[in-house]
Amino acid sequence: MLIKNIRKSINDIIEDEGTIKNIVDGVDIFKISKSQESVKQCYKKGIIFIFQGKKEILNEKSILTYDENNYLILSMATPVECRVYAEDDKPILGLRIDADQKIINDILFNSNISYSNESKPGIYTESLNNNLLDSLNRLINCFNNEEYSKILAPLYIKEILYFVLKSPHGYALNYSSYYNENYYSISKIADDIYINYKEKYDINTLAKTANMSTSYFHNLFKEITGMSPIQYVKKIKLHKARELLLSPKITAKSVAYEVGYDSLSQFNREYKRMFGHTPKDECHI
């Protein structure tokens, strides 16, 4: 059975809990051994597959479940709160693939895939089918072979992206102004905030960049992301800060300024409110 082969392959590669980033270009694999009631994370734009165990994303209006039957599609960087369901003998085993826009553009140019201009960017679950499992199995079998990783893995990644783009929520991977200019503007601004997290943002400037009124921009941004633009900016900064704090020989003060805070006390206060402990508690020094 394909999924059993995939589980064994990931288990063999990751002996202990953790994540291997860019095991091939644009692909991470991960293993989580313990259940957790509430985990705050920031997911990048892309696709997340789980082959064993389960995760739930807690939205204001619903719960999104992804597991061995359903995968996750994200059209932009998204701060989320999750529940994790894992056991010592059955850890979560998963894989994440970047949404490479160049590959996506090539697929769309050479296929008949099209989308409605009413399709919204956001975060969605989609059913995992045998075509995708077969492609994923072949991709994972490349990981221990350097030549396969260089030559075959990019072909399998493109194949996986093709099947995802053909799915009912495949539009979430591709947000261009061709489909809906306003949705594209929100998606683009969210990507810019994620990449340029050091910058200072205010809602009036963001709305002007999107060519929208402030109130319309605020409402549309919240409709798509589930949070206001300023909440989104703050969460992106704090998640990036948490990532930086896990680096060796770094201080809370340097991280605060690195992510764009002028006030260390404000940074400490907002960090503790979000994660339940201070930045200093997180530091590895």
Label the model's feature ranges.
Residues 1-23, 36, 142:
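A short, N-terminal "cap"/entry segment at the start of jelly-roll beta-barrel domains
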Residues 19-116:
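N-terminal regulatory/effector-sensing and dimerization cores
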Residues 106-159, 163, 189-191:
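Amphipathic alpha-helical segments enriched in hydrophobic/aromatic residues interleaved with Lys/Arg
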Residues 119-127, 174-177, 204-205:
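A ubiquitous short alpha-helical element
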Residues 128-131, 135, 156, 178-189, ...:
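N-terminal positioning helix adjacent to the helix-turn-helix/winged-helix DNA-binding module
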Residues 131, 145-148, 181, 198, ...:
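Alpha-helical structural elements of signaling/regulatory helical domains
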Residues 163-168, 176, 192-196, 200-238, ...:
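Basic/polar phosphate-binding segments, predominantly the helix-turn-helix DNA-binding elements
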